Amino acid sequence: MKQYLDLMNKVLAEGTPKADRTGTGTLSIFGHQMRFNLQEGFPLVTTKKCHLRSIIHELLWFLNGDTNVAYLKENKVSIWDEWADENGNLGPVYGKQWRAWGTADGRQIDQLTTVLNQLKQDPDSRRIIVSAWNVGELDQMALAPCHAFFQFYVADGKLSCQLYQRSCDVFLGLPFNIASYALLVHMMAQQCDLEVGDFVWTGGDTHLYSNHMEQTQLQLTREPRALPKLVIKRKPASLFDYRFEDFEIEGYDPHPAIKAPVAI
């Protein structure tokens, strides 16, 4: 995960001080890309311990089309708590857009099922895309989508994915995002009888919050370790039938966790 540390160094060296929605302040660059060959290991940051339970449960929550934090709280995942209302609702965030995008004529489009069918029936299509950026519903969302748009690509029997992330919290959020989409690629590949290819991450406003600088400097003193391996223990009937227990990470030997405040 040297690419991740290189990005941190780039933001520190080249970033522009900017105000932001949270009032915290950032150092920011615009436009950055990283490529991870998923054949070479699972891209889970090793220079600090990442909370894999949260990553897996959040993705399963998205895949279920859920937009209430009850499932997350039942599984001791608190990453969305700050944005939920008193009933645990978040509005039409990722799960709603991925599984039930509303159309002007009242239909709902299950983008993930559509994409799965495309991968199986027309893998050379250039339209294998999922978008969470629903302009008509942004004002109803507790938080506008940060990881907004992703595209799949099949070549030589391998499935690759590119994500466009319009806003990226490099210290706290990005390790989660990389691991989450890498996990999704593995799941989609298994369902489509493909090997995994690359995960390509593309960032828009890519920033370090001003109250993450000490933590960033600490992380940059640490040497990356070997990437772990993802094992999926069974092949469920569909993409939407995976359970937390289906996933195992082998050989994850991270440096200790580094705590930092979330900008809300």
From Swiss-Prot:
Reactions mediated catalytically: dUMP + (6R)-5,10-methylene-5,6,7,8-tetrahydrofolate = 7,8-dihydrofolate + dTMP
Assigned EC number: 2.1.1.45
Gene Ontology CC terms: cytosol
Residues that coordinate or bind dUMP: R21, R126, R127, R166, S167, C168, D169, N177, H207, L208, Y209
Residue positions binding (6R)-5,10-methylene-5,6,7,8-tetrahydrofolate: H51, D169, A263
Active site: C146 (nucleophile)
Keywords attached to this entry: Cytoplasm, Methyltransferase, Nucleotide biosynthesis, Transferase
Cellular localisation: Cytoplasm
Pathway: Pyrimidine metabolism; dTTP biosynthesis
Annotated signal peptide: none
Root EC class: transferase
Listed Pfam families: Thymidylat_synt (PF00303)
Molecular function as annotated in GO: thymidylate synthase activity
Family according to the record: Belongs to the thymidylate synthase family. Bacterial-type ThyA subfamily.
Subunit (UniProt): Homodimer.
Role, per record: Catalyzes the reductive methylation of 2'-deoxyuridine-5'-monophosphate (dUMP) to 2'-deoxythymidine-5'-monophosphate (dTMP) while utilizing 5,10-methylenetetrahydrofolate (mTHF) as the methyl donor and reductant in the reaction, yielding dihydrofolate (DHF) as a by-product. This enzymatic reaction provides an intracellular de novo source of dTMP, an essential precursor for DNA biosynthesis.
Protein name from the UniProt record: Thymidylate synthase
Gene this protein is translated from: thyA
